């Protein structure tokens, strides 16, 4: 993979992730909530993930792992562990239906919006990048 292509893939991941944080992600059953943007889900999920037993927030870690894989060679064990954790947390994120709040009430997610689906695409693309970069580095030099 050429350096230019790696940069383009890296920028696509960064821009896609930034857009997923800017776009509306979910709506809850609370009367006072409109569409919650992705950045709010990132902050709320990061701070209060332990109040609702969910690990889906940790799928966000696949993005910096993919960017690192585009830049530096990763050991196979690290890539395998990253892919496994991303798969588990992504499944959990897709099953996710509650949001913790600051007033100790758990709100139910009633609808997902484009920010959530773009986030899922970026996380899956990041996992694919990690897997492919490991595979490419394991091939003989003439087969890339």
What are these regions (language model features)?
Residues 1-144:
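Compact integral membrane and secretory-pathway proteins
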